[in-house]
């Protein structure tokens, strides 16, 4: 049996510039962090006496006798990629899917990590990110960027740069005290709305209107935000104000990024004392993140009392094998269906 634990991520700056159609021409960068909410993937080989080959438990329950019959496209293609057969796989997440936290890519990274361990192989964080990007973007042709896979694999508070069909990861150098202050001043609220990121990304980049200027402005904010984080003489409140700036830019990149309800909640938060914030992910729903000084946080919580607040702390580990107990495996010779 193999169990992997892979963190979800929140992206602060640069979202949209991690799309190959943009960064291969202009370069791209994001600042993001993983936090202590995870997806867990449990994989083991099936005993040979069951009348089915594989059993998969995700948002649905599947029992199949052929990998090609698997309905979940990500599971199916990852199994084919690593020649995985006769398994029982279960997925559990601390937070709901399609909510702007990179859940699909986190699942991809965690599942690939588990499959490699099942095969007795070790893969680097870079290799796991590259494989997850390949299966989601090239094999499944899902529209989206690269940052989610990289963040889930590496973990931590990082600047991720994208260029020439490649990426590089650089940790943000920040004192533990300053990092804790940032952590303490960020509040996460669940709107209760789920959506498909790939559909919103496709809408954003399929429109004939050129979004290059907004994306270049969002890219420039990555440098500004990094300077705020790493310069101990600067107030972290500037980070919150930059979040407000990047959110306003992001809203201009697609009609599905926000809606009237989200805009109303955002305005309520600013009036209650938040310095800035954003809707995480591609937009359309999910989680709202706000930067708010501690002395004003009760006002913010009261203003958004209809939303669920999700306590969190930053984490640094990225995907990891939590439990490793390998099994001997031989393909079954005959399947008797009942």
Language-model features: where?
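Glycine-rich active-site/cofactor-binding loop and its immediate structural neighborhood
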Residues: 285
